[in-house]
Amino acid sequence: SAPSVFGHLTVGLDENIEDMIFYKNILDSLILAKIVSSFEDINDKELVSFGASQGGAFSIIFSALNKNVTRCISLYPFLANFQHIYEKDNRINAYGELTHHGRWFNTTGKNTEKFLNNLYYLDTINFAKNLKCSVLFGITNLDKDCPKETQEKIYNEITSRKKSCIYKKYYHENIPNFNDKIVSFLLEVE
């Protein structure tokens, strides 16, 4: 298959969730962890997950599904609060394809509940409450791709040990200070 930049959220959305790209990506991450955990020099009882944006979502989802993860690091995670995003009708950010999908394939609104239910299976919020590991969570207040309110909703669902780093003047971008926080977080003794 060829590379793509649009449609990752909506491919397979009107069909079975098993046909959705992000569903397959999540399964791939679990398979990869199983492979890496079998390496001789890997301590498979103390895995760490890290990601930003889509990777931030995958870090949380993966950590919730793999009980060997002891630390999860997530910066402005994507894939959250789909109903809120869909109702905002934002066409220009990372979630824009939801609006386009609705306008092209759900013109009457008849299928809204079905495709939001399918997205519910991928919603990072639903995985956050199942985290058992320590979490370092970066929130960017000015982010247009992963709005602050969706990031906060994920964070508020986490019941395990957690620490947030709030960056009031940052968008969806590299945050050098967060890199320092990651190092400190990984060096902490629990």
Give each language-model segment a name.
Residues 50-52, 75-76, 167-168:
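Alpha/beta-hydrolase-fold catalytic nucleophile elbow
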Residues 111-127:
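Active-site nucleophile elbow and catalytic-triad environment of alpha/beta-hydrolase enzymes
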Residues 51-61:
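Glycine-rich nucleophile elbow surrounding the catalytic serine of serine-hydrolase chemistry
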Residues 145-148, 152-190:
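C-terminal catalytic histidine-bearing segment of alpha/beta-hydrolase fold enzymes
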Residues 61-108:
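Hydrolase active-site cap/lid region
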Residues 1-27:
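Cap/lid segment of the alpha/beta-hydrolase catalytic domain
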Residues 131, 137-139:
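Short beta-strand/loop motif that positions the catalytic acidic residue
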Residues 41-53:
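Alpha/beta-hydrolase fold nucleophile elbow
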